[in-house]
């Protein structure tokens, strides 16, 4: 893999993930609706407005129009830029310091970088979740916040809940991205090396990065989905006058309530759309990042 300065990795990582976000945001809208459907209700006791991936896409388009599939895109792009810029910058610093050469170092570096990125990007993810949950009353699932735009949502939350309100739900976001980042970066590097060792593809081919991203995406979805469901619930729940969540007290409380009231399988709600969103996003992000790093490395060689 090409070596580039951490500051360059910040720009490349943010750019790669923003590019991927443009393609995968419709899947994020569907995933959010499915994860909020039947909140804290036993299976079979609530109307299923969204059923599976294709039917859910149709339901979103009927309720919100074709543009409804790109709800929350601005917030999503802001989140991807902030979170992944910080994440790839910190990961690059760790690799530069030699941590990735130590046993388990890639996992640790990926987890720490993911935690820092999740904290920085949390306000954008909060708004993204709330915007994507919004729809007409007949198709509404979860609490409806009635925001008009990204900036309007940030202003409303700031005015009503203060600075702390912008980071509400961060307790669920940090472990979510920690496990996802550790799985993604560790398995991508290992998968790429494994594919290259077998010489199935030319060593510098973009197909190597594509194969690595596909393998990595399976690991990411497997470990990240329960935390993804919890994060969606924490970010979208209504709050009281003191800014405290009305439904969940935090990560552990949310996990326990979902398990007890909806059953353990509810932690994998929307698994199909989750993979259809996180899978392509992981594949595209890692592919774009790897190819942009090659271009940056080539540019450095040409300039020297």
From Swiss-Prot:
InterPro entries: Mito_Carrier_Antiporter (IPR051508), Mitochondrial_sb/sol_carrier (IPR018108), Mt_carrier_dom_sf (IPR023395). GO terms for biological process: blastocyst hatching. It is found in: Mitochondrion inner membrane. GO terms for cellular component: mitochondrial inner membrane. It holds the Pfam family Mito_carr. The chain crosses the membrane at residues 7-27, 45-65, 98-120, 170-191, 206-226, 278-301. It catalyses: a dicarboxylate(in) + sulfate(out) = a dicarboxylate(out) + sulfate(in). PROSITE patterns: SOLCAR. Its main location: mitochondrion. Solcar repeats lie at residues 4-97, 101-194, 204-295. It comes from the Eukaryota. It is a multi-pass membrane protein. Keywords: Membrane, Mitochondrion, Mitochondrion inner membrane, Repeat, Transmembrane, Transmembrane helix, Transport. Belongs to the mitochondrial carrier (TC 2.A.29) family. Putative antiporter that exchanges dicarboxylates and sulfur oxoanions across the inner membrane of mitochondria. PANTHER family: RE38146P (PTHR45928), SOLUTE CARRIER FAMILY 25 MEMBER 34 (PTHR45928:SF3). This is Solute carrier family 25 member 34. The gene is SLC25A34.
